């Protein structure tokens, strides 16, 4: 990597963030596309967020990525939001357009890009969970023309989830159906009608647990996806594959959300196949 007086910076901002794989992805991409850039990880306190955002302009950076807990906190410091960032209410990418700071959320786009030969337009989706990742998938699905969405959360989270879905309906006219995850007969009924089943919860990170009971039967044509990539094969994915269904983990989402951000910053396509190779070797 060449560093000189013309090198432009990009960074991922979060707390904690030192474990992040984003520098690996983006620095590979800068190198492969002969872009004079460098990507670093900044672990900051909340009190430093305004100053950090000001530094994007000050140092003429490409921009930044954001992770927890700053995806929502950053919004007041930006000049403009993209449609999906406004719907989600969270930003994971800030682009410096000649001193104008524009907030995007590339998580949902990254998720749908990583699904092999699948488009969500006109399809039905069952989504488990309603946290940050789920919201980005929800909003992107609506923007991309999904026909029906059933969201399942634990019954204790129903009340907390409803206002966001009401706000989505207000902004888009699209009604999302909400159910309790404990209602197994409803879960089975919705899954049978679905083209896509997504686990957007953290259940399965321990390598032991699954968000759905094994007694659930999957329909003939369904794609199953998990946003988790460590472990590489969660019990949820193992269960789907045991029923002969195509199933993808969350590593592709991580790569393709980064590719979307890279294109917004540089105008260049990230060489995803090359980087995917390195990532799978690292995590498999």
Curated annotation (Swiss-Prot):
The active site is at 71 (proton acceptor). NADP(+) binds at residues 83, 129-133, 227, 250. Transmembrane segments: none annotated. It catalyses: shikimate + NADP(+) = 3-dehydroshikimate + NADPH + H(+). The keyword S-adenosyl-L-methionine does not apply. One of its GO terms (molecular function) is NADP binding. Pathway: Metabolic intermediate biosynthesis; chorismate biosynthesis; chorismate from D-erythrose 4-phosphate and phosphoenolpyruvate: step 4/7. InterPro entries: Aminoacid_DH-like_N_sf (IPR046346), NAD(P)-bd_dom_sf (IPR036291), SDH_C (IPR041121), Shikimate_DH (IPR011342), Shikimate_DH-bd_N (IPR013708), Shikimate_DH_fam (IPR022893). Belongs to the shikimate dehydrogenase family. HAMAP family: Shikimate_DH_AroE. PANTHER family: BIFUNCTIONAL 3-DEHYDROQUINATE DEHYDRATASE_SHIKIMATE DEHYDROGENASE, CHLOROPLASTIC, SHIKIMATE DEHYDROGENASE. NCBIfam families: aroE (TIGR00507), PRK00258.2-4 (NF001315). This is Shikimate dehydrogenase (NADP(+)). It comes from Streptococcus pneumoniae (strain ATCC 700669 / Spain 23F-1).
